[in-house]
Curated annotation (Swiss-Prot):
UniProt name for this protein: Pyrimidine/purine nucleoside phosphorylase
Organism of this sequence: Shewanella halifaxensis (strain HAW-EB4)
Record-linked InterPro entries: Ppnp, RmlC-like_jellyroll, RmlC_Cupin_sf
Catalytic activity: a purine D-ribonucleoside + phosphate = a purine nucleobase + alpha-D-ribose 1-phosphate; adenosine + phosphate = alpha-D-ribose 1-phosphate + adenine; cytidine + phosphate = cytosine + alpha-D-ribose 1-phosphate; guanosine + phosphate = alpha-D-ribose 1-phosphate + guanine
EC number annotated for this UniProt entry: 2.4.2.1, 2.4.2.2
Gene Ontology MF terms in the entry: guanosine phosphorylase activity; purine-nucleoside phosphorylase activity; thymidine phosphorylase activity; uridine phosphorylase activity
Its biological purpose: Catalyzes the phosphorolysis of diverse nucleosides, yielding D-ribose 1-phosphate and the respective free bases. Can use uridine, adenosine, guanosine, cytidine, thymidine, inosine and xanthosine as substrates. Also catalyzes the reverse reactions.
Family of the protein in this entry: Belongs to the nucleoside phosphorylase PpnP family.
Pfam families for the chain: Ppnp (PF06865)
Organism domain of life: Bacteria
Keywords tagged on the record: Glycosyltransferase, Transferase
Cellular component terms per the entry's GO annotation: cytosol
């Protein structure tokens, strides 16, 4: 079943769905700075645009462009900077 989600006053929108192997969501982030929290481990794949990310336990920002992905541990917070509208796929678990 599809579920539409909206965060940060509409600046981030996603659609959750049952992926082939794990739950997932696909969405778009508007230009801005965000902090997300995870309940379970996540794999974030950048579809279009770029995400500059401060991952848990890291001290330097990393930029991930279209076609690249990064892992986020569960039960953690991470920061994201978006300089152009960016589409992503997030796989949970």
């Amino acid at each position: 079943m599809l579920a539409v989600n909206e965060y940060f006053e509409g600046q981030v929108k996603s659609i959750s769905f049952d992926g082939a192997e794990k739950p997932a969501s696909v969405g778009v982030m508007e230009v801005g700075d965000y902090e997300f929290g995870t309940a379970a481990p996540e794999v974030m794949q950048v579809i279009s645009g770029a995400l500059t990310v401060m991952l848990p336990g890291q001290t330097e920002w990393q930029t991930f462009n279209a076609g690249e992905q990064f892992d986020v541990i569960g039960n953690a917070k991470f920061q994201v900077k978006v300089e152009t509208q960016t589409a992503y796929l997030c796989i949970y678990g």
